[in-house]
């Protein structure tokens, strides 16, 4: 493929999977930008021939010269969890402002911005507020762009969310669940979402917004049971009152600089969102992978399921 693709936040869950897919599809000019040098090293080992750039987009630097009128820029960088509001402001808002300024100065053929379903959710936390602001920056930038809003994603190279829970389940005889665990989720398989991103890179639908929602509605507790099943584990699931669970999370956060699961995420889990999205087959040309098959591929694949990136 002749198009040059520049990916920000390239060493995270979406970025690792997207770059790997782009290389599988024959894209030769891929630039991966991330501030996490160790995770970029993992990416370099997975996808040979990718140009990797260690850079913090909130700070001026040589990275600002990486854009040109022949490039499609995929905006993935995001602060998803954290203890301090300023982390979200810095990495979701300030970094995006500087990125858009660099693109204005140098040019780009198109921007594919990955937002989040939280911008249309009932949640009100630092992640939601700053993702709303980030999306608005892109939408008002006057640059050619489209926006995709995925629901909770899972798959290879996931240091957070279901990936972390999957690994935690392997290490403990007891797995705690808040309340009855019947919090409806619409998880989206990362390889399916990357197929939508590739479509956007190739079709460049200007000023369009796509809500990309996992096809299966499933309760959180049933997701945990399915992960346990496909991995052949015998971990006991124990239900803990939601209030106590929240208090335990807040206490844990006092002693951890990077808590894997926060009280804000628990509130988002129990918010009761029910998202509607585009028909992925009609719009992007693919039918979503059946959920159990996707979970099995995510956590049992002999090539990639054991590859870890840092949070």
Residue ranges of each PLM-predicted region?
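N-terminal Rossmann NAD(P)H-binding glycine-rich loop of SDR-like oxidoreductase domains
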Residues: 5-25
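SDR active-site strand-loop-helix element
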Residues: 8, 33, 73-77, 111-117, ...
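Conserved glycine-rich Rossmann-like NAD(P)H-binding loop of the short-chain dehydrogenase/reductase
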Residues: 27-37
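NAD(P)H-binding glycine-rich loop region in Rossmannoid oxidoreductase-like domains
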Residues: 48-98, 102, 117-121
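Conserved beta-loop-beta element that borders a ligand/cofactor-binding pocket
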Residues: 136-156, 166
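Substrate-positioning beta->alpha
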Residues: 159-164, 179-201, 208
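Mid/C-terminal beta-alpha module of Rossmann-like enzyme folds, strongest
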Residues: 200-261, 277, 283-311
